[in-house]
């Protein structure tokens, strides 16, 4: 299938959140990402799809997996990739996000990838620049490419998403990963559960079309997929749990709690992992863990997203590839 066939019905020029995508949009991106996976296993991994195009990564929050994944995805497609060193930039001198955006826009990039601590930062940027904008995480709001790579991991491992029971466990309140995954997995036909102490659940959880559990025993019963989330202590301003030790006992994934799920369930984690806090080392490194597969799928997904957005923008502008 050619690139044009994949993206002929994809209308978006930015990826700001899963909430903006239809089931058809999700399917297009996942199908293209799935087609990218075999290519990533070849010795020669470089394509020329984005040759002559410029990608700028603008990360205002620390990142290892996501930033390096976007860098590799862009380079695999042949783009010129520049990652801004925020610590050495004018942002540290008081420059606003909008001023930074307009400065970068003057450099005529084709793709701008942003991670920021403020919800809505990517959407604001998209209004100020003339290129494709990809949200790599905005506060506790959304992380769309993480949800896409999680969906691809599940789909390739389990053969489907529709009809599966997916349990998302941990700090739901502060997690942009949880929000994006709830949206995508619900849209793709999964039964989504969340498991957390009441202090780590958002007030809006009742409106998210999920089943809510306050114990791992009940929440993991019959689960096909377990997605563990770390405690985001950098976003916490009060006391949300009695102690780390107690939290791990009741809400961590260890052998005792894992036994409640299906014997063939798979385990996901967006990283970074806090071993002994939300997941035991033997589980994170065990045969049911798909954590390294998620990293691999991340490159395939981000390649697909950049291809799709740029293809849509070029069609809208009438510019040749």
From Swiss-Prot:
Pathway: Pyrimidine metabolism; UMP biosynthesis via de novo pathway; (S)-dihydroorotate from bicarbonate: step 2/3. Transmembrane segments: none annotated. It is an enzyme of class 2 (transferase). Carbamoyl phosphate binds at residues 65-66, 115, 143, 146, 271-272. Gene3D superfamilies: Aspartate/ornithine carbamoyltransferase. It catalyses: carbamoyl phosphate + L-aspartate = N-carbamoyl-L-aspartate + phosphate + H(+). Keywords: Pyrimidine biosynthesis, Transferase. The keyword Transferase applies. Heterododecamer (2C3:3R2) of six catalytic PyrB chains organized as two trimers (C3), and six regulatory PyrI chains organized as three dimers (R2). Catalyzes the condensation of carbamoyl phosphate and aspartate to form carbamoyl aspartate and inorganic phosphate, the committed step in the de novo pyrimidine nucleotide biosynthesis pathway. This is Aspartate carbamoyltransferase catalytic subunit. It comes from Bartonella henselae (strain ATCC 49882 / DSM 28221 / CCUG 30454 / Houston 1) (Rochalimaea henselae). The lineage of its organism: Bacteria, Pseudomonadati, Pseudomonadota, Alphaproteobacteria, Hyphomicrobiales. The gene is pyrB.
């Amino acid at each position: 299938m050619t690139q044009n066939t994949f993206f002929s019905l994809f209308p978006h020029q930015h990826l700001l959140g899963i909430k903006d995508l239809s089931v058809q949009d999700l399917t297009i991106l996942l199908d293209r990402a799935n087609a990218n996976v075999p290519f990533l296993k070849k010795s020669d991994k470089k394509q020329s799809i984005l040759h002559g195009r410029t990608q700028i990564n603008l990360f205002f929050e620390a990142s290892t997996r996501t930033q390096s994944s976007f860098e590799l995805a862009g380079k695999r497609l042949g783009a010129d990739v520049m990652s801004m060193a925020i610590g050495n930039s004018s942002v540290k001198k008081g420059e606003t996000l909008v001023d930074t955006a307009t400065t970068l826009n003057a450099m005529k990039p084709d793709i701008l990838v942003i991670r920021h601590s403020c919800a809505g930062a990517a959407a604001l940027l998209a209004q100020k620049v003339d290129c494709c904008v990809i949200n790599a995480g905005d506060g506790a709001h959304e992380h769309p490419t993480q949800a896409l790579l999680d969906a691809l991991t599940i789909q390739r491992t389990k053969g489907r998403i529709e009809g599966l029971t997916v349990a998302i466990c941990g700090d739901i309140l502060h997690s942009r990963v949880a929000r994006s995954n709830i949206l995508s997995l619900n849209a793709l036909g999964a039964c989504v559960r969340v498991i957390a102490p009441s202090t780590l659940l958002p007030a809006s959880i009742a409106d998210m079309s999920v089943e809510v559990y306050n114990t791992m025993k009940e929440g993991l019963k019959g689960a096909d997929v377990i997605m563990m989330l770390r405690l985001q202590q950098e976003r916490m301003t009060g006391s949300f749990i009695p102690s780390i030790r107690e939290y791990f006992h009741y809400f961590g994934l260890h052998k005792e709690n894992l036994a409640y799920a299906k014997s063939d369930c798979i385990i996901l984690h967006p990283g970074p992992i806090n071993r002994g806090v939300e997941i035991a080392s033997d589980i994170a490194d065990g045969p049911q863990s798909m954590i390294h597969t998620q990293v691999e799928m991340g490159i395939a997904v981000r390649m697909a997203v950049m291809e799709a957005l740029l293809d849509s923008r070029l069609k809208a502008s009438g510019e040749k590839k």
